[in-house]
C-alpha cells in the first residue's frame, strides 16, 4: 500500500519526458486545471492591499500571498501546512503556488478563439467550408446561419440577414433552426461527422479535374484528418470556459502615492469579466434581443483582445494610448517568451570592461584586472578563507574581502590558478567569439587581450569592450579548457586555415626583418652558425638586410613522420637567419628564406600545424608575435607626405585621355555616336587611364635605384614605408595607395551610375571643391550601407542557424555510394580553385582510377589529407566523386564520412559535432564584410570592358566540350550552340583553363591542336548576336515586305543600306502576324533540309534583327546572315553581395528566369498568340511533344529545327534553382548554388569551405512532394519530410505494397525553418501564432531532436558533450521500460488494494 502511495506521489512530478504535445484544451480540461471561478473584476483592496475575494487575485482560489500564512492571519507557520482556514477559505501553503494555480471564467455565451478564426487559413472556416467573412458576420451578430433546415427549402450553413430571417420565420414557422453568434458556429462544428467527411473527400478528390479545387479539397481533408487523428474536437475551437493565468504571472504592484503598476493582462481580464457578468445579468432579466446581442458581441471582442489584441479591428488601448499587450504578444517577437526568456537568459558571474593590448601575454592567457577578479571569484575566496581558518564565518570572510586585506590577494591568486575564464566580444558571429583563457592578475581596470586572437574576435583596441564569464562547475571548467581554450582554436572552422595569424605591426616587423637590400653593411660575409649571426648583428657589424651565407643545421620532418637531419650552407640574409632561430624543429629553412608577407606567414603557421602539431605551433605563434613586435619597433617605419611619390607620367596620361574624350564629344556633337555609346566609351577610356596611372605609380613606388658593391647602379625592391605596408599585407592595398598617390578615378552617383568626369587628383595633391563634392556621394552611401548591412547580415545568420540547428553528426558511416562530382573550379580561363583544394578534407565516394587504366589510385572511403592532395595533383587527376552532406543517407543528422574533416581540428569529424550551426556561422560571419556596395575605397567605381576573344594563358592541347559547330570554307569553326566550352589541357591531360564560347564565335583551332601561351583561339562580336547558316545554298526572303515587316536604313557614315526587321508593335496591321524568315534553297530553287533532319532550313528573324545578305545571294556554311544587336550600355543590374546570398538561400525565383528545355528533342514553333510565341519540343523517342508559351520580347537562343537536351538553356536570364533541381537533379543544383555563393564570397576574398554551403542545402532539400500516393496514406501534392516518406516506403515494400513516388523540393531557408518537424523550434523562429495554431490543431508532438527545442525546455543539447547524456538517458530508459505504469494500471491496482484491505 505504501509503495502505491509513493507511486501516486511520483505521478505528479514529470521529470523524464521524451516529447511535448500541444493540443486544443477541452472545457473539461480547463476546469480540471482550475482552482476556482473568478466571478468579480476586482483585484486588490486599495487600502489594505489584500486581494479581493472571488476577484482576479483571490487568495482562496490562487493561494496565500505570504508563505504558510492564511489571509486573515489565523493560521501561520509550517505546522499548519495544508490546512484550509474556515474563516477566509485560504489553504496554508507556499506563496509560490500563486505562480502555478490557474482559475477559470464560465462564459455566459460561447466565444470563438481568434487564433483558429483569423490565423490564415481560418481553421473554423475550412472545417465548415465557409468563407472567413461569412463566419465573422455570424460571430459578430450581423447574420443568421441555418443550422438545421428541417423540411424547408433552406440549406444548412446558409446565411440569412434580418429581413430574410423574418421572412423565413413567417413562411416556415418553427420548422427550421437558424441562429447567430458563436453558439451557432459551435453547433455547426458539433454536427460535423469527421469520419464520414474524410471518406467523402477521399472519394471526391480523384474525381475532380480542376487543380484549384483539388488543392482546396485536399486542404480540407488534411485538416479533417488532423482533427480526427489528434483527438481534438472541432467544437473546442469555440471557448465556453476561459482559463485565467496565475496572478503572479500578471502581477499588480502598488507604487508609492497610491498608484498601481499592473500587467496589461489584468485590464483585459477585467474587461472580459465585466462584460460576462453584465451579459449574465441581462440574460437573467431576459432583456430585449438586440441588447443581449450587442453584449454578446462585446464579450466576443473582449476575449479576442485578451487572446490576441489587434488581430481583428482596432487594438484596445490602455490609459497611455498604447495597445495593450495580450497573451499572444507575450510569447511572440524578440521580446516574447521564446526569444527573450527561453532561448536567451542573463548570466551571473560575469563582468565587462574595455580591452587593451597584452603584447607580453602567452596565447592561452588574458590579463584580468584585480578588482574584477575579486568580484567574480568572491564565493571561491570566501570558501578558501574559511577552509584556511583565516575567517570563522562567511560574514567575516565577506568583511575581509571588502577591506581588501593583503591575505585576500594571496588567496585570490591561488583561487584563480588554472581556473579558466571565458572572454566574449559582442557581436558573437561565430563560435570563436567566445574563447577560454587563463587569467593573469593585473593592475588597472582594462582587460588585456592577446593580439593574435583579435582576428577571431574581430576586435581592435579603439574602445571595444569584452565580457568575462566564470565557468563554475568542474565539468564547465573541463570543457572550457579542453574545447574552448584559445590554444585549441588555431584553425578557423569556416575554411580550415589558421585564424591565429599575425597582422599589422607584427607582419610589418617580420617583413622588414626578412627583406634583403643591396650593399648593406656586412654583405657577403659567411657565418658558421646561427649564433654567430646573432652576435655579429647585436654588435652592429651587419645590417638586418645584408645578403650573407650561413651554415645551418636543420631537422626535417616528412608528412609520414620520418625525420632527416642535414647541414648545408644557404644564401640568405641576416634577418632570415635570426628568424630561423624561433622556427620549431622539423621545419626546413626554406620556409623563412623569403620576404615574410602576410600570406607567407599564414602558410608557415598552417604548415607548422600540419608538420609538428598543436603545441609547437602555439609556442611558435607566440614567438613570431614577440619577434614581429620587436623588429617593427627597431625598423621605425612611419609614413610621411614625401612617401607618396606621384609618377611623372601622370600628367601625360591624363592629357592624352582628355584629348580622346574631346574627340568623342565632338563625334557625339556631330551625331556620329549616340549618347549611350559616348557614355560607355568615355567611361572605358577613363578606366584605362586610371589603370595606367596606377601601374606607373606602383612601378615607381616599388623599385628604387641603389649602388651595389662594385659601384654599379642596381635596382631593388623599394623601402618606401607606404609600399612596404601594402606589400607586406600589414595595412592598406594597391587601390588605396592609388587614391593617395595616383588618381582617385571614376566615382558613382547615389543611384549607382558612374559619373563621366573622373577625379584626376589624388589625396596628396588635394581635391578641389567639385571633386570633393563628387566624393561625398560614395562616402555617404558607404556609411548608410554599413548600418543596413550589419542588420541584414545578422538576420541572414539567424535564418541559417535556424534552418540548420538540428543537424548533428550522429553516426560514423551511412554507407552510401552517392556523392558530388568534383572538378577544378575554372573561371574565365583561370583555375580559381584547383581540384586538390576542393577535395581536401573530403571522403572519396568511389575508387579513383588512373586516367586511361583500371588501376585504383585512391580507394573509396579515403579521407583526403594534404598528402593525398599532392598525390592527386601528381597523377593529374581531373575529376573525383566525393561524399557530400547533400547525398548523406543518415535519417536524423548526418554521418561523419559524408561530412569529412572537422575543419577546426584537422581530423575526421567527431560524432556529436553540431555541423549545422558551424555551417551557418561560417556563412553568416563574413556577411558583414560582403558588400551592399563597397565602403572603404569610398565608392570608387570599377567597370570592365566587354570580352570579345579567347586568349590562351598556358600552352597546351585544345579540348572542345559540348560544342556544336560548322566548318567555314576557310577552315575556321563557327559555334552554333550556346553551352559550348573550350578548354586547354597540359601534357598530363589536366585542365588548366576553360572558356565559354558564345553562339557565333569563330574558332581558329580544332580539337587536339597544340597551342602556345598568348594565342588568340576564338573571336566574336560582343555587341551583336549573329545567326549562322549551317549549309551552303541560295537565300530567299520569306514574308519580308518593305515598311510592313522590314525597313531599310542607310548608314550616314558608310552609305550602305541595312535591312532591319520591324518590331511587331511598330508594324502596320497587315504585318502583325507575318513572320519574316530567310529560307535556304539549292540552285534549282528546291527547299534544303537541315542536316540530319527533315526540317526545312529556314531561319526566323526576331525583331530588330539586321539582315546582312541580299535576296538570291549565294552563301557558304558558317556565314552570318543576320545580326541581332545586344544592348550592352544598359548593363543588367546584377545583384551582388549580401542580397545575392540571401536570394540564393531563400531559393527565390528570379524575375525573368532563363527558360530551360523541359525535355530533350527538336525545336519548332507553333501558332503564336497575342504577345507570346509557342515553342514546341518534339522528343526523339516519339512521345508527346511539349509546348510552352514564351513572351515575344524574350530573346531565344534556339532556332527552328535545333536539337536540345533536357535542361539546356532556351532563353538566357538568371537561373531558377527550382528548374535546375526539377530538370537536372540534385547534384546540378548543388553545383550551381555552391558556385554562385562562392563567387560572391570570393569577390570579397573570403574563403568558405564548400561543405558548409552543402550542409545548408541539405536542410533546404528536406522536403519532397508526393507525385503518386501508391498504398500510402499520403495525398498527391502533399509536401512531406523525406525521412517520413522513406520510412513509410520501407514499411510498404516490406508488405509488398505500392510505394509512394515523390520528387525533391527545394525550400528557402525561412520556409524550411518554419516547416521543420519541431514546432517549438519553428515557433521560436518566426510567425509564432501561425505555427502554434497549426501545431495545436494537428495535436503535434515535438520529440526534442534538435538543439533549440532542448534549450527551450532547459536540457543539455543533443550535440557535443550533451550527446553522451542523451544517449545514456535513452539507454537507461530502454533498460527499465517495463517499469513504466499507465494511469489506468495505477487505478486498477488501487481498487484491488482497497478491496483486499476491506476484506
From Swiss-Prot:
It is an enzyme of class 2 (transferase). Pfam families: RNA_pol_Rpb1_1, RNA_pol_Rpb1_2, RNA_pol_Rpb1_3, RNA_pol_Rpb1_4, RNA_pol_Rpb1_5. Keywords: DNA-directed RNA polymerase, Magnesium, Metal-binding, Nucleotidyltransferase, Transcription, Transferase, Zinc. Its EC number is 2.7.7.6. Zn(2+) 2 binds at residues 814, 888, 895, 898. Mg(2+) binds at residues 460, 462, 464. One of its GO terms (cellular component) is DNA-directed RNA polymerase complex. One of its GO terms (biological process) is DNA-templated transcription. Binds 1 Mg(2+) ion per subunit. Binds 2 Zn(2+) ions per subunit. InterPro entries: DNA-dir_RpoC_beta_prime (IPR045867), DNA-dir_RpoC_beta_prime_bact (IPR012754), RNA_pol_asu (IPR000722), RNA_pol_N (IPR006592), RNA_pol_Rpb1_1 (IPR007080), RNA_pol_Rpb1_3 (IPR007066), RNA_pol_Rpb1_3_sf (IPR042102), RNA_pol_Rpb1_4 (IPR007083). Gene3D superfamilies: 1.10.132.30, 1.10.150.390, 1.10.1790.20, 1.10.40.90, 2.40.40.20, 2.40.50.100, RNA polymerase II, clamp domain, RNA polymerase Rpb1, domain 3. Zn(2+) 1 binds at residues 70, 72, 85, 88. The keyword Transferase applies. DNA-dependent RNA polymerase catalyzes the transcription of DNA into RNA using the four ribonucleoside triphosphates as substrates. Belongs to the RNA polymerase beta' chain family. This is DNA-directed RNA polymerase subunit beta'. It comes from Stutzerimonas stutzeri (strain A1501).
Amino acid at each position: 500500500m505504501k509503495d502505491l502511495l509513493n507511486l501516486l506521489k511520483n505521478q505528479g512530478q514529470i521529470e523524464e519526458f521524451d516529447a511535448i504535445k500541444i493540443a486544443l484544451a477541452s472545457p473539461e480540461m480547463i476546469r480540471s486545471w482550475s482552482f476556482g471561478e473568478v466571478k468579480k473584476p476586482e483585484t486588490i483592496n486599495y487600502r489594505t492591499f489584500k486581494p479581493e475575494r472571488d476577484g482576479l487575485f483571490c487568495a482562496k482560489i490562487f493561494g496565500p500571498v505570504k508563505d504558510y500564512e492564511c489571509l486573515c492571519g489565523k493560521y501561520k507557520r509550517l505546522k499548519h501546512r495544508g490546512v484550509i482556514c474556515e474563516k477566509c477559505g485560504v489553504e496554508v501553503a507556499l506563496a509560490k503556488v500563486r505562480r502555478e494555480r490557474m482559475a477559470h471564467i464560465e462564459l455566459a455565451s460561447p466565444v470563438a478563439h481568434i487564433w483558429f478564426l483569423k490565423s490564415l487559413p481560418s481553421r473554423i472556416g475550412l472545417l465548415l467550408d465557409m468563407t472567413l467573412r461569412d463566419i465573422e458576420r455570424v460571430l459578430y451578430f450581423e447574420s443568421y446561419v441555418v443550422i438545421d433546415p428541417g423540411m424547408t427549402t433552406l440549406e444548412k450553413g446558409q446565411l440569412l440577414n434580418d429581413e430574410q430571417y423574418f421572412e423565413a420565420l413567417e413562411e416556415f414557422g418553427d420548422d427550421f433552426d437558424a441562429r447567430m453568434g458563436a453558439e451557432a458556429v459551435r453547433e455547426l462544428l458539433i454536427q460535423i461527422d469527421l469520419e464520414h467527411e474524410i471518406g467523402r473527400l477521399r472519394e471526391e478528390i480523384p474525381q475532380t479535374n480542376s487543380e484549384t479545387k483539388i488543392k482546396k479539397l485536399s486542404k480540407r481533408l488534411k485538416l479533417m484528418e488532423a482533427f480526427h487523428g489528434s483527438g481534438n474536437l472541432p467544437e473546442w475551437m469555440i471557448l465556453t470556459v476561459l482559463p485565467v493565468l496565475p496572478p503572479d504571472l500578471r502581477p499588480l504592484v502598488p507604487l508609492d502615492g497610491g498608484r498601481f503598476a499592473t500587467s496589461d493582462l489584468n485590464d483585459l481580464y477585467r474587461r472580459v469579466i465585466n462584460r460576462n457578468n453584465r451579459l449574465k445579468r441581462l440574460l437573467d432579466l431576459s432583456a430585449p434581443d438586440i441588447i443581449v446581442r450587442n453584449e454578446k458581441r462585446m464579450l466576443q471582442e473582449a476575449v479576442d483582445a485578451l487572446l490576441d489584441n489587434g488581430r481583428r479591428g482596432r487594438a484596445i488601448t490602455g490609459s497611455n494610448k498604447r495597445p495593450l499587450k495580450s497573451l499572444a504578444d507575450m510569447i511572440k517577437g524578440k521580446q516574447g517568451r521564446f526569444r527573450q526568456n527561453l532561448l536567451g537568459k542573463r548570466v551571473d558571474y560575469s563582468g565587462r570592461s574595455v580591452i587593451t593590448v597584452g603584447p607580453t601575454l602567452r596565447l592561452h592567457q588574458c590579463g584580468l584586472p584585480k578588482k574584477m577578479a575579486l568580484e567574480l571569484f568572491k564565493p571561491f575566496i570566501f570558501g578558501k578563507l574559511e577552509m584556511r581558518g583565516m575567517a570563522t564565518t562567511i560574514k567575516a570572510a565577506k568583511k575581509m574581502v571588502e577591506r581588501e586585506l593583503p591575505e585576500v590577494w594571496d588567496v585570490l591568486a591561488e583561487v584563480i590558478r588554472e581556473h579558466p575564464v571565458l572572454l566574449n566580444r559582442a557581436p558573437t558571429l561565430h563560435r570563436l567569439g567566445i574563447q577560454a583563457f587563463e587569467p593573469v592578475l593585473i593592475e588597472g581596470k582594462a582587460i588585456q587581450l592577446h593580439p593574435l586572437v583579435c582576428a577571431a574576435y574581430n576586435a581592435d583596441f579603439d574602445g571595444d569592450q569584452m565580457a568575462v564569464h566564470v565557468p563554475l562547475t568542474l565539468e564547465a571548467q573541463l570543457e572550457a579548457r579542453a574545447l574552448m581554450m584559445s590554444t585549441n582554436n588555431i584553425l578557423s572552422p569556416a575554411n580550415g586555415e589558421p585564424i591565429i595569424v599575425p597582422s599589422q605591426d607584427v607582419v610589418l616587423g617580420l617583413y622588414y626583418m626578412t627583406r634583403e637590400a643591396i650593399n648593406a653593411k656586412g654583405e657577403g660575409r659567411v657565418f658558421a652558425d646561427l649564433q654567430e649571426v646573432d652576435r655579429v648583428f647585436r654588435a652592429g657589424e651587419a645590417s638586418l638586410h645584408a645578403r650573407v651565407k650561413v651554415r645551418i643545421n636543420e631537422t626535417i620532418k616528412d608528412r609520414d613522420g620520418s625525420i632527416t637531419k642535414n647541414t648545408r650552407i644557404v644564401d640568405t640574409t641576416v634577418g632570415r637567419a635570426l628568424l630561423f632561430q624561433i622556427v620549431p624543429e622539423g621545419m626546413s629553412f626554406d620556409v623563412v628564406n623569403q620576404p615574410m608577407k602576410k600570406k607567407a606567414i599564414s602558410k608557415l603557421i598552417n604548415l607548422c600545424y600540419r608538420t609538428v602539431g598543436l603545441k609547437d605551433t602555439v609556442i611558435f605563434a607566440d614567438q613570431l608575435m614577440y619577434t614581429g613586435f620587436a623588429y617593427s619597433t627597431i625598423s621605425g617605419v612611419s609614413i610621411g607626405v614625401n612617401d607618396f611619390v606621384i609618377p611623372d607620367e601622370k600628367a601625360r596620361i591624363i592629357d592624352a585621355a582628355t584629348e580622346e574624350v574631346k574627340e568623342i564629344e565632338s563625334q557625339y556633337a556631330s551625331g556620329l555616336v549616340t549618347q549611350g555609346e559616348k557614355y560607355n566609351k568615355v567611361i572605358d577610356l577613363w578606366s584605362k587611364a586610371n589603370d595606367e596611372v596606377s601601374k606607373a605609380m606602383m612601378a615607381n613606388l616599388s623599385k628604387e635605384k641603389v649602388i651595389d658593391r662594385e659601384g654599379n647602379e642596381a635596382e631593388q625592391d623599394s623601402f618606401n614605408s607606404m609600399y612596404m605596408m601594402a606589400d607586406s599585407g600589414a595595412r592598406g592595398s594597391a587601390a588605396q595607395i592609388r587614391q593617395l598617390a595616383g588618381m582617385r578615378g571614376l566615382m558613382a552617383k547615389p543611384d549607382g551610375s558612374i559619373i563621366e568626369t573622373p577625379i584626376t587628383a589624388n589625396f596628396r595633391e588635394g581635391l578641389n571643391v567639385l571633386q570633393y563634392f563628387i566624393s561625398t556621394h560614395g562616402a555617404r552611401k558607404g556609411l548608410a550601407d554599413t548600418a543596413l548591412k550589419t542588420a541584414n547580415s545578422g538576420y541572414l545568420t539567424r535564418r541559417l542557424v535556424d534552418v540548420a540547428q538540428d543537424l548533428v553528426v550522429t553516426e560514423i558511416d551511412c554507407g552510401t555510394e552517392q556523392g558530388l562530382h568534383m572538378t577544378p573550379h575554372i573561371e574565365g580561363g583561370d583555375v580559381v580553385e584547383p581540384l586538390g583544394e576542393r577535395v581536401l578534407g573530403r571522403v572519396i565516394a568511389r575508387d579513383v582510377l588512373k586516367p586511361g587504366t583500371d588501376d585504383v589510385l585512391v580507394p573509396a572511403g579515403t579521407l583526403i589529407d594534404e598528402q593525398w592532395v599532392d598525390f592527386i595533383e601528381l597523377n593529374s587527376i581531373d575529376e573525383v566523386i566525393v561524399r557530400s552532406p547533400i547525398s548523406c543517407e543518415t535519417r536524423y543528422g548526418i554521418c561523419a564520412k559524408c561530412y569529412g574533416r572537422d575543419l577546426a581540428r584537422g581530423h575526421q569529424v567527431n560524432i556529436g559535432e553540431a555541423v549545422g550551426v558551424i555551417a551557418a556561422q561560417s556563412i553568416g560571419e563574413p556577411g558583414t564584410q560582403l558588400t551592399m556596395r563597397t565602403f572603404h575605397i569610398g565608392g570608387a567605381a570599377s567597370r570592365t570592358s566587354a570580352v570579345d576573344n579567347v586568349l590562351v594563358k598556358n600552352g597546351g592541347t585544345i579540348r572542345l566540350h559540348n560544342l556544336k559547330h560548322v566548318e567555314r570554307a576557310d577552315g575556321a569553326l563557327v559555334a552554333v550552340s550556346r553551352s559550348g566550352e573550350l578548354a586547354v589541357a597540359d601534357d598530363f591531360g589536366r585542365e588548366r583553363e576553360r572558356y565559354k564560347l558564345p553562339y557565333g564565335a569563330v574558332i581558329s583551332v580544332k580539337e587536339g591542336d597544340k597551342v602556345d601561351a598568348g594565342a588568340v583561339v576564338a573571336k566574336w562580336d560582343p555587341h551583336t548576336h549573329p545567326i549562322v547558316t549551317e549549309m551552303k545554298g541560295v537565300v530567299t526572303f520569306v514574308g519580308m515586305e518593305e515598311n510592313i515587316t522590314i525597313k531599310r536604313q542607310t548608314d550616314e557614315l558608310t552609305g550602305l543600306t541595312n535591312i532591319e526587321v520591324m518590331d511587331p508593335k511598330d508594324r502596320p496591321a497587315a504585318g502583325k502576324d507575318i513572320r519574316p524568315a530567310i529560307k535556304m534553297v539549292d540552285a534549282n530553287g528546291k527547299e534544303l533540309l537541315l542536316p540530319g533532319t527533315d526540317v526545312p532550313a529556314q531561319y526566323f528573324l526576331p525583331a530588330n534583327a539586321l539582315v546582312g545578305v541580299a535576296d538570291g545571294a549565294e552563301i557558304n556554311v558558317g556565314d552570318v546572315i543576320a545580326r541581332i544587336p545586344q544592348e550592352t550600355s544598359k548593363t543588367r543590374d546584377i545583384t551582388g553581395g549580401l542580397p545575392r546570398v540571401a536570394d540564393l538561400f531563400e531559393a527565390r525565383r528570379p524575375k525573368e528566369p532563363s527558360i530551360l528545355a523541359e525535355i530533350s528533342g527538336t525545336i519548332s514553333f507553333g501558332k503564336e498568340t497575342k504577345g507570346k510565341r509557342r515553342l514546341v519540343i518534339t522528343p526523339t523517342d516519339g512521345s508527346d511533344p511539349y509546348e510552352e508559351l514564351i513572351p515575344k520580347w524574350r530573346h531565344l537562343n534556339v532556332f527552328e529545327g535545333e536539337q536540345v537536351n533536357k535542361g539546356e538553356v532556351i532563353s538566357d536570364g538568371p537561373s531558377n534553382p527550382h528548374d535546375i533541381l526539377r530538370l537536372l537533379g540534385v547534384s546540378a543544383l548543388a553545383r550551381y548554388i555552391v558556385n554562385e555563393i562562392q563567387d560572391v564570397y570570393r569577390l570579397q576574398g573570403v574563403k568558405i569551405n564548400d561543405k558548409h554551403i552543402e550542409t545548408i542545402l541539405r536542410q533546404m532539400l528536406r522536403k519532397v512532394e508526393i507525385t503518386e500516393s501508391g498504398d500510402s496514406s499520403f495525398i498527391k501534392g502533399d509536401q512531406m519530410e523525406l525521412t517520413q516518406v522513406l520510412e513509410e516506403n520501407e514499411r510498404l515494400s516490406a508488405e509488398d505494397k505500392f510505394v509512394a513516388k515523390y520528387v525533391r523540393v527545394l525550400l528557402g531557408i525561412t520556409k524550411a525553418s518554419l516547416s521543420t518537424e519541431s514546432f517549438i523550434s519553428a515557433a521560436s523562429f518566426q510567425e509564432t501564432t501561425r505555427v502554434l495554431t497549426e501545431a495545436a490543431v494537428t495535436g503535434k508532438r515535438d520529440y526534442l531532436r534538435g538543439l533549440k527545442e532542448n534549450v527551450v525546455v532547459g536540457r543539455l543539447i543533443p550535440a557535443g558533450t550533451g550527446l553522451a547524456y542523451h544517449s545514456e538517458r535513452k539507454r537507461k530508459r530502454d533498460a527499465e521500460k517495463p517499469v513504466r505504469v499507465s494511469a489506468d494500471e495505477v487505478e486498477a491496482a488501487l481498487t484491488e488494494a482497497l478491496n483486499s484491505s476491506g476484506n
